[in-house]
Amino acid sequence: MVKPRQREYPTLKSSLNIIRETALIAISCVFWIYCLVVLLVYIGTIFEIHDESINTIRVALNIENTEILDIFETMGIFAIIIFVFFTISILIQKWQKGRES
């Protein structure tokens, strides 16, 4: 009788392209820095922080305070509408399940 042996698993040989991986990391870092800058400008606008760097970035991005506040107002209205819609949907589902049982 043949004694059982451990299975031999094939090894995975990987050769990463260093240039491609470096480019992906660089693009990702640039994207995250841009996101942080925009977040900083939005927070500065919401809390009415009049800092020179925030104002400079706002001018470079060609954004006015009123535009940002209008965007947040619109987002708030849509968030309320979606909240009401989903709340009513859940209540209707619970009401229908209550009638069935």
UniProtKB/Swiss-Prot annotation:
- Source species, domain of life: Bacteria
Tell me where in or outside the cell this protein is found.
Cell membrane
Instruction: State where it is primarily located.
Output: membrane
Protein keywords: Cell membrane, Membrane, Transmembrane, Transmembrane helix
Show the GO cellular component annotation of the record: plasma membrane
Membrane spanning segments where?
24-46, 71-93
Q: InterPro entries, per this entry?
A: IcaD
Membrane topology (UniProt): Multi-pass membrane protein
The reply to whether Transit peptide figures as a keyword in the UniProt entry is: no
NCBIfam families named among the record's database cross-references: PIA_icaD
Family assignment from sequence similarity: Belongs to the IcaD family.
What does this gene product do?
Necessary for the synthesis of poly-beta-1,6-N-acetyl-D-glucosamine (PNAG, also referred to as PIA), a biofilm adhesin polysaccharide. Is required for full IcaA N-acetylglucosaminyltransferase activity.
What is the protein name given in its UniProt record? Answer: Poly-beta-1,6-N-acetyl-D-glucosamine synthesis protein IcaD
Lineage start: Bacteria, Bacillati, Bacillota, Bacilli, Bacillales
